[in-house]
A protein has these predicted regions:
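Short glycine/serine- and acidic-residue-enriched loop/turn motifs that recur at repeat junctions
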Residues: 1-16, 46-67, 101-127, 156-183
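Short loop/turn motifs that cap or connect beta-strands within the blades
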Residues: 13-17, 71-74, 131-132
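Short glycine-/Asp-/Thr-/Trp-enriched loop segments that recur within the blades
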Residues: 19-24, 75-79
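Beta-rich catalytic cores
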Residues: 25, 32-33, 64, 80, ...
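Short coil/turn segments that connect the beta-strands within blades of beta-propeller domains
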Residues: 33-34, 43, 88-89, 98, ...
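Conserved core positions of repeat-based scaffolds
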Residues: 35-38, 47, 90-93, 102, ...
Length: 183
């Protein structure tokens, strides 16, 4: 039908290129509950959609955007994003040298646990590093948790664990993190 896509269709989004250089191509993309983010081939990170839960990386809980906007970075930021993964309450990015950064609300972004830097607040409106045991090669976010594959082959997860999704025991305390021991 007119409202569906098949394998030979493209998605036409009027205004999608607003603010983006016409030469930039999408390198990676992920969608969450009410927002989406993409990494462009220049390794910049852009998000759009509903801004609640700090999803757009704008430093506040109120912004929403129907067109892609760049995620806020500190002055002098030079590291490049190579992948992005969105959950329902948080988003995570993988940077070029294996750092994982997350932003959003609650423990899903890593708050209140040993994997989070001391500067991480309960609600983080901008990307904040997750303290992993080694550099990451992949990050994936679920409803209220995330996991990363590390260069040494192990997996570390953080966030909610009501159903044992962190692989550290069924219904452990919310916010408890642990190494899954997957090799």
């Amino acid at each position: 039908g007119a409202d569906t896509l098949d394998t030979h269709s493209s998605l036409n989004m009027p205004g999608f290129q607003s603010g983006l250089a016409s030469t930039n191509q999408t390198f990676d993309i992920s969608s969450g509950a009410d927002s989406a983010c993409m990494v462009l081939d220049d390794r910049s990170l852009w998000c759009w959609g509903y801004g609640a839960d700090y999803a757009l990386g704008q430093g506040n809980n109120e912004s929403s955007s129907s067109t892609p906007i760049p995620v806020l970075r500190p002055a002098g930021w030079a590291e490049q994003t190579i992948a992005v993964s969105l959950g329902s309450y948080h988003n995570c990015e993988l940077l070029a040298f294996g750092t994982v950064q997350c932003w959003g609300t609650q423990y899903a972004a890593g708050a209140d646990g040993p994997l989070v830097s001391a500067s991480f607040s309960y609600n983080s409106g901008t990307p904040t590093p997750v303290a992993l045991d080694a550099a990451a090669v992949l990050v994936d976010s679920g409803y209220d948790h995330s996991c990363a594959i590390l260069v040494n082959g192990s997996v570390q997860c953080w966030g909610g664990n009501l159903y044992g999704q962190l692989a550290v025991g069924y219904k452990c305390v919310t916010g408890t993190e642990g190494d899954c021991g997957v090799h």
